[in-house]
């Protein structure tokens, strides 16, 4: 579902929205689709090659995500529409790739992270 994908990607440092599609059987709280905010990416100065890397990260994470099988309640044994399992190896690789991209294109380049960590962490 869109909720599975958005949640798994968020765990890996990629933020997007889960959105309904026309005639979506899952409704607005689960959804079947996701929406990417490309203006945020281009505002950071990313271009075609970075978008290809983002697409690769998304593909990796979605390929490593599956619905969690419910283990209790009346739906025990059924796949959840909200909960998911994300392969830990996939998550680690995706986080590393996301970090590498954001190291090159920081969201807030004017922040002194060393100062903030020293005084507020």
Roles of regions detected by a PLM:
Residues 28-121:
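PLP-dependent enzyme catalytic core of the Aspartate aminotransferase-like
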Residues 11-35:
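Conserved PLP cofactor-binding pocket of PLP-dependent enzymes
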Residues 1-11:
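Long hydrophobic segments that form regular secondary structure
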Residues 1, 15, 47-48:
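Helix N-cap / loop-to-helix initiation motif
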């Amino acid at each position: 579902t869109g909720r599975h994908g958005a949640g798994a990607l968020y765990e890996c440092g990629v933020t997007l929205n889960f959105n309904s599609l026309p005639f979506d059987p899952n409704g607005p709280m689960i959804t079947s689709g996701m929406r990417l905010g490309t203006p945020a990416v281009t505002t950071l100065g990313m271009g075609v090659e970075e978008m290809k890397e983002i697409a690769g990260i998304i593909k990796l994470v979605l390929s490593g995500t599956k619905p969690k099988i419910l283990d209790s309640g009346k739906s025990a044994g059924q796949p959840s529409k909200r909960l998911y399992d994300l392969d830990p190896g996939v998550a680690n690789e995706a986080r590393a790739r996301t970090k590498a991209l954001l190291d090159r294109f920081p969201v807030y380049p004017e922040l002194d992270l060393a100062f903030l960590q020293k005084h507020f962490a």
